[in-house]
A protein has these predicted regions:
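Short phosphate-binding loop-to-helix
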Residues: 67-103
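Short aromatic-hydrophobic micro-motifs that form the base-stacking/packing surface
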Residues: 105-107
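Conserved alpha/beta core of the MobA/IspD/sugar-nucleotide pyrophosphorylase nucleotidyltransferase superfamily
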Residues: 168-231
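Conserved donor-nucleotide/metal-binding helix-loop-beta segment in metal-dependent transferases, i.e.
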Residues: 113-140
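N-terminal nucleotide-binding beta1-loop-alpha1 segment
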Residues: 1-22
Length: 231
């Protein structure tokens, strides 16, 4: 077991066609495809090289019977949970992992731009004696990265209560004594404006550092299919 742990968690089911939330004007299949390749891109980034942390990949319980072969690889530590009840996930299902690892980082599966190098920077920020939090937020203030070096039920109560909204979380935790590192402008793909930004980001050469050629080709399929939305 490593001192550090990473948890990739989607906001909802995205593989079950009966309940998946369609992404903007995308078809159900393309909505599933977008969410899948965002998630699989993170898996590829974290498992391609020598592991330096324990990884826990979470899917919604309703996706259990719809997982594709890419999620079935032997090296993927897959867990299923009722994502409509994050409080149970944080306070019960992963309590043992949270308390047995020194540093923990929770990532939204909708995030782009994170690789092993970035993760190492995050863990270095958490690797201090004082209790601290690491929060990465989008321009809209949605929390997509949440790291901590000391488990606190009060902190997670605030995280769930805030619905992962940064300002609401700060208001809830103002009486708690944690130092907070804040990362601004992380990119979460939640709507069509973010999809446009994704297109711009992946058009840059530096994107190869966190998105392989294989993954680029998968995203390109969607960019071509929905080119009218990119205007």
């Amino acid at each position: 077991m490593f001192n550090n742990a990473v948890y990739i968690i989607p906001s909802a089911s995205f593989l079950n066609p009966e309940i998946v939330n369609t992404f903007e004007n995308f078809s159900i299949e393309d909505s599933k495809f977008l969410k899948s390749i965002l998630y699989l891109n993170l898996i590829e980034n974290f498992l391609a090289d020598e592991k330096k942390a324990d990884y826990f990949f979470v899917l919604d319980e309703f996706d259990r019977n719809f997982i594709t072969d890419e999620f079935k690889a032997d090296n993927i530590n897959l867990h299923f949970a009722d994502l409509t009840k994050p409080k149970l996930l944080f306070e019960n299902q992963f309590l043992k992992e949270f308390t047995s690892h020194k540093n923990n980082i929770i990532l939204s599966s909708d995030i782009i731009g994170i690789n092993q190098t970035e993760l190492n920077k995050y863990f270095n920020l958490l690797n201090i004696d004082d209790e601290c939090l690491l929060i990465g937020k989008s321009r809209e203030g949605t929390i997509g990265v949440f790291g901590f070096n000391s488990y606190s039920m009060d902190i997670f109560n605030c995280l769930v209560k805030s619905d992962f909204i940064y300002n609401n979380f700060l208001s809830c935790t103002k009486t708690l004594n944690h130092f907070i590192h804040t990362l601004n402008d992380i990119l979460l793909i939640k709507n069509i404006e973010h999809f446009k930004q994704l297109y711009i980001e992946l058009s840059q050469k530096k994107s190869m550092e966190y998105c392989s050629q294989k993954m680029h080709e998968k995203f390109t399929h969607l960019f071509i299919e929905y080119k009218e939305l990119l205007k």
